A protein has these predicted regions:
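Bacterial N-terminal signal peptides that target proteins for export
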Residues: 1-10
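Flexible, surface-exposed loop/linker segments and immediately adjacent secondary-structure boundaries
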Residues: 24-53, 57-150
Length: 150
């Protein structure tokens, strides 16, 4: 009886971890330096969801993979908001990916959503909206310059 209880507890913990991973829209694939999600420090495999804000301190970097296999690379001093994200491979007409680039530099390699319908992908940088018509983009935003223009 004693050996069954620890096994059951371990199975429950594994199941809870797996369910959390399945419900995530993406995750931190790897990172270096001070990287935060909603103000909290990340760890390897930190789960990401719609409406999360990801911030990299100067000199830091992060690689994010979303559930459609698109990849976002953030350089140091960057901040993005996953403003909308939905991926269902069996209903591609409902898929959407919208990212607001608040500061810094983002590199993007497209995944399944862009392949199925590029109109379902957009990036907002300041007053600009960027659509994807290829498989790779790089965007830099300087929020100080944007404020000076207003």
């Amino acid at each position: 009886m004693r050996s069954i209880l620890p096994t059951r507890v371990l199975l429950l913990l594994l199941l809870a971890t797996s369910i959390n991973a399945w419900s995530a829209d993406g995750r931190i694939l790897n990172f270096e330096g001070d990287v935060r999600v909603n103000g909290q420090p990340v760890t390897a495999d930190t789960a990401l969801k719609k409406e999360d804000t990801i911030t990299t301190a100067p000199g830091a970097s992060a690689k994010i993979i979303l559930s459609d296999n698109s990849v976002l690379d953030l350089e140091g001093g960057s901040e993005i908001l996953i403003s909308d994200y939905s991926f269902n491979p069996s209903a591609p007409e409902t898929n959407t990916s919208k990212v607001d680039i608040l500061a810094g530099t983002l590199r993007y390699v497209s995944g399944r959503i862009a392949k199925d319908d590029p109109d379902n992908i957009s990036f907002t940088a300041g007053n600009s909206t960027i659509g994807v018509r290829g498989s790779f983009i790089s965007i830099s935003v300087d929020p100080k310059a944007e404020k000076a223009e207003k």
